[in-house]
Amino acid sequence: MLLWEQIAANRRAYQVTVALVVAALALFGLLVTLALGLGVSGLGAGLALAVLVVGFAPGMGERAALRDAGAQAADPGRWPRYHNLVEGLAQAAGLPMPRLYVADSDAANAFSVGRDPERAALVVTRGLLTTLNRVELEGVLAHELNHIWSWGARLATLGVALGRVPGLLRLLAPARREFDADEGGARLTRYPPGLVSALRKLAGGVQPPDRPGLRHLWIIAPGDATHPPVDERIAALQEL
């Protein structure tokens, strides 16, 4: 799927999610006020609550994800390769560069969060930066940048805030999005084998601590329903 197609699909999914949340909260407010004998005034209160939840959820989700991952701003002096690769990819695509963070973990993994492509954050673990070679790291970073630029990161970030709602994560973070980001990242680097090699290393390495709010964000999350099997992702990349 091309980037513009991903953007359209992710925006539709976001709109559907917002509509569902608004409808659910409005209905809840209405039922409560009817039960209390207050008439239909609760419908307005429910709608107001829904607007607040939807408006603040992406920002809350981003802050929660960075906090739970223990992410700190990436020092360019300490991690120059990280900064240089992201800058190069952003310039090549002509798209915004996210804020860069590093999580102090031996596990090799990465994720992206944000409200939109101009206000996004890319998080990698220390283990990722020390485990992968330059070509492999570029493949992973391109994958995450695709999530950001396709507006997929906004959906996933909303999932951090609202992920406890049954079934909502399947809508916000479908398994298909990983295939799309793999393909988009490979198109950006023009070298699918780099990401293939990275996925193999990540799948066989140490995994980050299992925090339910972050599970759907990681590029590798074995056994999670929001991620397709790594072997299937590799097979798809090898067909490009």
Predicted regions and their residues:
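Hydrophobic or amphipathic, alpha-helical segments that drive membrane association/targeting
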Residues: 1-111, 162-171, 175-179, 189, ...
